[in-house]
Each structure stands twice: as C-alpha cells, then as structure tokens.
Amino acid sequence: MGRPLLLIAAGGTGGHMFPAQALAEAMVRRGWRVKLSTDARGARYAGGFPHVVEIEEVSSATFARGGPLAKALVPLRIAGGVASAVAGFLRDRPSVVVGFGGYPSIPALSAAVALRLPRMIHEQNGVLGRVNRLFAPRVQAVCCGTWPTDLPEGVEGYYTGNPVRAAVLERAAAPYIVPGDYPMSLVVIGGSQGARVLSDVVPEAIARLPEEILANLRIAHQAREEDVARVTEAYDRAGLLAEVKTFFTDIPRRLSEAQLVISRSGASSVADISIIGRPAILVPFAAATADHQTANARGLVEAEAAILIPESALDPGALSEHIAAVLSQPDAARQMARNALAHGRPDATERLVEVVEHLARKET
C-alpha cells in the first residue's frame, strides 16, 4: 500500500495559507504525500511549503472582483475547476481533503463531496467565511481556529486553535512580569497593514497616563508607512520613549516582554497573544467581513483575558483609563495573562493532524 495522500485546498491570502502550510509540514514529517490546491494568487504564498508538496493551480474565481462579465463567468470557471478536481482525484485518490477557506478551495471540496471522500475544513476566524459556511454541513469535521465560533445550526465544531509560527511557540507561556515600578513594555499591533485608528488614538491616550506609569513605559508601535512620521512626532512631543515601525521582525519577543498589548483582533494576532499569554486591549477592525474580528476577540474577552473596545467607542480618554487600569493593578494583570494562556492552543497543528488521521482511519 502506498503512502496516504492529503489534499489541502486553500485560498490566496496569508490567513488561509499559513495554517495550511503548518499542517502540510506536519503531515510530510509523518510520511504522508501532500498536494496543495490553490489559485495563482495563493501560489504566491506557497514558497514556504515543503519542497515535496506538489502545488496544483486550479481554475477558480470570486464574485467580489471584476465587472459584470467577469462575475457572470465565475460559475463557469468554478465548474471547470470542479471537473478538473474530480478527474485529478480519480487518477490519484486523496485519503483526506482539507479546506482552509477561500474561493480556490471550492473545486477540491466539491470534488470530495461528489466522490464521497473524507473531508474537513478549518476556519481561522470566529465567523465562518462564505466558502466554509457553504461546506460546513457537507464535511465530516469542522475545525475552529477561534473559540467560540458561530456555526450553522446542526453543525458541531472542534476547537483546534490556529497554528502559529515557530518563533511564537518558542515563547509560549513565557513568564509574565507584572507591571511595577521598573521599565515596562507596551506593544501596539495594527495587523499586517498597521491600523490608522490606533495611530490616531493610542499616542494621545498614552500621554494622558499618570506620571508614575509614564516614567517607566517603553512603547513599540506598528504603524502604516504613511503614519510613521506623525506617530513618532506625537510620542516625541509627549516625551515618551517609543519605537515606531511599519513592521517588527521580532514581534514574538516583544509580546513575551510586554506588560500589555493593544491590538486588532485578527485571528493570528489573537492566537499569538493567547499562546504567549499576555493581557490585551483589543480593537476589532470595524469593516471586517461579518464583523469577524469582534467574534475573534470574544473568547479572550469572555475568559477575562482581554478588554474589548469597539472602534466606534475608541477615544483617547477611554483608552487611557483602560491602559492605566491594567498597568496599575499587577495582580489583575497577572490573572489576565493566566486567563489568556489557558485559552490558547499551542498544539493547534497537532490537533489538526489528529483529525486528519482519524478521518483517514475511518475510511480504511
């Protein structure tokens, strides 16, 4: 009997592709063959996959882009992708098919349904994306990166967590130094593109803190390129020691050394914060599809590990009060850190592997 084949189907964004890559790496180590089914955009994110993973570009499309003619052709392009996937599966039958969301996962999952192959999906956010919502009732397992996750009626989810980078795992459960009368670190993360609203509000909010906190505070603030100069100037005017960059290559280290994190609540940011275990103030991106960033934050907020401030309610005064509350109460901050850690899933990849192998065993 040959080696089992895992077919991974994922859309063309980093949010879909990173957990797919983590699973691919783990399954290759366990002796499986792995194929990745994605579109041309997704293939650009596939450079980090193990070199033994075969990448198949599929015909897919989205209704979100293009003019009327392009939208009219979407069903035909998807149908062509499904037919191609069915033919490919008949030639080389996957043991399990895993979808990570995005329109490019439609052909492989549709083919798996048609051929009654073992199949599962992984959703990174607290609200199912359009494609995962479509397939949730049609797969044997729905793995959730964020918990709780809003699921269709009758569908049960399994909280695996979101796989994170090795650099984050190396800092998992790093000892938390509570706020005190010594140098403290505050980290501001705006997601992959920075966040203008955090650049607008955070510097002024910090400047309003009591002097006994400001005297010890060191700030690392991720901002958009066009905002770096004005944010730096705002901190300088307030006499604050701040490092402002568009991207920090050592975010895991900075998180592990932080007394408090102010962040958007993208799925990967929430996973990093919970696995390292740090108190957080979360400001969900208001324009996120289906308000999924608010859903992402819900688990940490309900665990009393994070404070949620809707973007519409974010102002310097309110934010300053929340920052001061965390940094002036060391026992409460320590408990928030513990609660975050308890909510995390550092073994997310291993949990996904277990589900894949369980489905494969059921088939044999």
UniProtKB/Swiss-Prot annotation:
Disulfide bonds: none annotated. Its EC number is 2.4.1.227. UDP-N-acetyl-alpha-D-glucosamine binds at residues 13-15, 125, 165, 192, 293. It is a peripheral membrane protein. The keyword Glycosyltransferase applies. It is found in: Cell inner membrane. Its main location: membrane. The keyword Chaperone does not apply. It comes from the Bacteria. It catalyses: di-trans,octa-cis-undecaprenyl diphospho-N-acetyl-alpha-D-muramoyl-L-alanyl-D-glutamyl-meso-2,6-diaminopimeloyl-D-alanyl-D-alanine + UDP-N-acetyl-alpha-D-glucosamine = di-trans,octa-cis-undecaprenyl diphospho-[N-acetyl-alpha-D-glucosaminyl-(1->4)]-N-acetyl-alpha-D-muramoyl-L-alanyl-D-glutamyl-meso-2,6-diaminopimeloyl-D-alanyl-D-alanine + UDP + H(+). Pathway: Cell wall biogenesis; peptidoglycan biosynthesis. SUPFAM superfamilies: UDP-Glycosyltransferase/glycogen phosphorylase (SSF53756). GO terms for molecular function: UDP-N-acetyl-D-glucosamine:N-acetylmuramoyl-L-alanyl-D-glutamyl-meso-2,6-diaminopimelyl-D-alanyl-D-alanine-diphosphoundecaprenol 4-beta-N-acetylglucosaminlytransferase activity; undecaprenyldiphospho-muramoylpentapeptide beta-N-acetylglucosaminyltransferase activity. GO terms for cellular component: plasma membrane. One of its GO terms (biological process) is carbohydrate metabolic process. Keywords: Cell cycle, Cell division, Cell inner membrane, Cell membrane, Cell shape, Cell wall biogenesis/degradation, Glycosyltransferase, Membrane, Peptidoglycan synthesis, Transferase. Belongs to the glycosyltransferase 28 family. MurG subfamily. HAMAP family: MurG. Cell wall formation. Catalyzes the transfer of a GlcNAc subunit on undecaprenyl-pyrophosphoryl-MurNAc-pentapeptide (lipid intermediate I) to form undecaprenyl-pyrophosphoryl-MurNAc-(pentapeptide)GlcNAc (lipid intermediate II). This is UDP-N-acetylglucosamine--N-acetylmuramyl-(pentapeptide) pyrophosphoryl-undecaprenol N-acetylglucosamine transferase. It comes from Cereibacter sphaeroides (strain ATCC 17023 / DSM 158 / JCM 6121 / CCUG 31486 / LMG 2827 / NBRC 12203 / NCIMB 8253 / ATH 2.4.1.).
